[in-house]
Amino acid sequence: MKKLLFTGLFAALIVACFAQKPYKVVFYNFENLFDTIRNPEIYDEEFTPEGPKKWNTPKYTKKINNLSRVLFDIAAINKDYPVVIGVSEIENRNVMEDVIATPKLAPANYRIVHYDSPDARGVDVAFYYRPDVFKLEGSAPIPFTMESLPNFRTRDVVTMWGTIDGEPFYFMVAHWPSRLGGKEASAPKRERAAEIMRHAADSVLAINPATKVVMMGDFNDDATDKSITEVLGAEGNIRKLQPGGYYNPFIDMLKAGIGSLAYRDQWNLFDNIVVSENLATGSTGSLKLERAPKGKYYGNIFRAPYLFQQEGQYKGYPLRTFVGNNFQGGYSDHLPVFIYIGECQSQYWLRLNISHRAQTT
């Protein structure tokens, strides 16, 4: 009689994580998107028909269509409109509405979160969002305050919160104070702006550690500057992240010489999207930061050829709307940046390794 004796019987549980329906989150500095109407409460004279730029309806319409084209082409990358778009340098809600009323963007049915800020030039930051994906629960501005400069006024931080696929998200968009007066002399203002955003993010995570925080904007500092790496606390190495920490996927890109704006023949990366550790690693929930298909970095910069000067002194620079008061018909002096957020799902296979031998009795 033969018996089969099973030895070395074991099961291995294999877990595979893969991205589905990647969502895009975008930040884009619209570079002085003003309407043509004089507003006596702000300094917008140069962007009027009578001003030095002779800003009129044809130029404004060209600018609106240019911005619409860029956002549509970002959507076309994976045939899906971005879920959230943070923007800066917009004069008011009306100009935002004109952008999304264009035929290219109207199908996305975007909604707007905007607050007028105390900036002297009247430029604000704001959000577009897709209500079919991001379920808005609330929004609020956070004013810039600095004890040593009580009369200094700049853009508010605009925040909004809600859910994506049932998971809590908290978004912030900002345009930190400029380098007017020099990088070092003006650094305390940007460090204070970073402190304000970091405090808000930490407070949100203290209430609910599962909330996924996304901080974006034109920070007027490079991704490797103190305001971002130390004050905001954005880590460039995803493997070094600790719970409650923050990750900046654009640090590696800057170190590789890749930037979002050019100045004096050098690329800078002022446009950043910083995410909380739980979004970077997927330590809570199922949504996490993803690379683009075949992508090297977790951050992305949209670099379509038409966004660049093709000739002249500034060949290779972003094609802006004006150089001085000379209309160029371009897009922005900044390139748009974006990230992908994918859904990480688990699949399980049971692998049986069985060895057997025959035994005669």
Where are these regions (language model features)?
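Structured beta-strand-rich core segments of catalytic domains in phosphoester-bond hydrolases
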Residues: 90-170, 174-176
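N-terminal, active-site-proximal structural segment of metallo-dependent hydrolase catalytic domains
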Residues: 18-103, 113-125, 297-300, 310-315, ...
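Sec-exported extracytoplasmic/periplasmic mature domains
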Residues: 72-76, 92-105, 133, 198-209, ...
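Extracytoplasmic, non-cytosolic globular domains
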Residues: 114, 158-253
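Structural recognition of the beta-strand scaffold that forms the well-ordered cores
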Residues: 24-27, 83-88, 111-114, 125-129, ...
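Metal-dependent phosphoester-hydrolase catalytic domains
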Residues: 203-213, 221-353
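Bacterial Sec-dependent N-terminal signal peptides
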Residues: 1-22, 361
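Second-shell loop/turn segments in exported
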Residues: 49-60, 81-87, 114-115, 146-148, ...
